[in-house]
From Swiss-Prot:
Name of this chain's protein: Uncharacterized MFS-type transporter C530.15c
Key words of the record: Membrane, Phosphoprotein, Transmembrane, Transmembrane helix, Transport
Chain positions with Phosphoserine modification: S31
Membrane topology, from the record: Multi-pass membrane protein
Amino acid sequence: MAERTSESSSESASFDLEKQQSNHHDRYQSSVSSELEESLKKYPVISNPQDFIVTLDGPDDPDLAVNWPLAKKLRNVAVMGSACLCAGFGSSIFSGAVPEVMVKFHVCRTVALLGISLYVLGFASGPVVWAPMCELFGRRRPMIIAVFIFCIFHIAVATAKDIQTVMICRFFCGFFGSSPITTVAGSFSDMFSARTRGLVIAVYSAIIFNGPLMSPIVGGFIGKSYLGWRWTSYITAIMGFTAFTSMIIFHRETYTRTITEIRASKVRVLTGNYCLHAKSEEEPLEFSYFFHKYFTFPLRLLIFEPILLVVSTYTAFVYGILYGLLEAYPVIFGESRKWRLGVESLPYLAIFVGVCIGCSSVALFQPYYFKKMDENKGRPVPEARLPSMMIGCIVFPIGIFWLAWTGNYPWIHWIVPTLAGSFIGFGIITIFQQTINYIIDCYSGCSASAIAANTLLRSSFGAAFPLFTTQMFNNLGIGWAGSLVGFVAVGLIPVPFMLFLYGPKLRQMSKHCLKD
């Protein structure tokens, strides 16, 4: 029942786009030249075109991703998760290569750090392309192609002879690596109903954050070892090719539109009737139409949807802090406490623990969400996702202030600022994962584009923060630099509470949001 209601809400959310498609198609048909019109008289006119449209067999069709066996869904989740892990892992493993890159190419630390920032900037620009691609061609094909090219560019980084090649290739690593990160949330929306989606998104969120958290530790020890900085990229490429191979073997298409087109193609071959087609195949092949409907849609959502803009800005700040910590921890534990490269990254493990605790806490709030869904006749209730985020938004600044003022004094035992990371990790993951759930529930009819808009904004912050974090902590001092970030986090605490109170009214005013 939940799957049917979710599907009906998706149809209502995309009604305006379908109407626009129909109007555009009518104008296209009316522009046929008179010469072509004359030649068309030789061919019979189909009086019942609806009879030639191939559709799925209702909401219970076994080919629909939401109706797949659980084992098949989990297999898809595993291979997509591995691709996301590679993309996140590659973003910050380069931090371990920074000292050697500075020496090898005779550049300052800020220039070397561009290897991280340009990668995350690729994360920001990629969704503008990958979200439309996954709406046009399905989730599988664009993702597989992107993961393969992602691996090729990592090999190019590893074999680069100059700093320009390193930076350009790092950008394209992020650009193509953003494909699975952008696509996966939409694919989860295809496979899981609102009732079960929360736990899957929790796993996805853990992958998104734990990749960047674990890779600096690996990168630090690799950069210091006999392998050298180039192996930070070789290892990421090896991981990527493993994920690529797994996707080719095990991954299956989840997007309903593409599944219908695949069925139509099979039916044409089996029947020999090449008039048979899916409704989506009637779209006019005009660039202006596709550009307006697909390529600008994430940007329009971000600009004109207040809910999406507010939660994406909050997520962007949190994501920026995550990448800012990649530079703050070397200052706190490396420069201040004189820890060596590799060892100075070990406190990231505390953030990792906090992320894992935050993910497991989702299960505690599931009964509350189920209760609200049952009260709403089985329909999703986006605001019921927010209580755990309310806790996270309070815990997050506590961790920031704790880290700032205990890390400020080297004579305080190292375990004290290290433990602050668990609070930061808990806050980051609860804010992030419930934001993703909230967006998917609100924009179920265009979830891939909404997540793309969110990814674009948060990755822009992630690219910017590492560039000024080191200077900020050196100039303001660890205590006040951390406090500045903490005060901003405190200022954002009201966001989930305001959405909990006024979210339903804002959704009623939206063109694309789920209505009560």
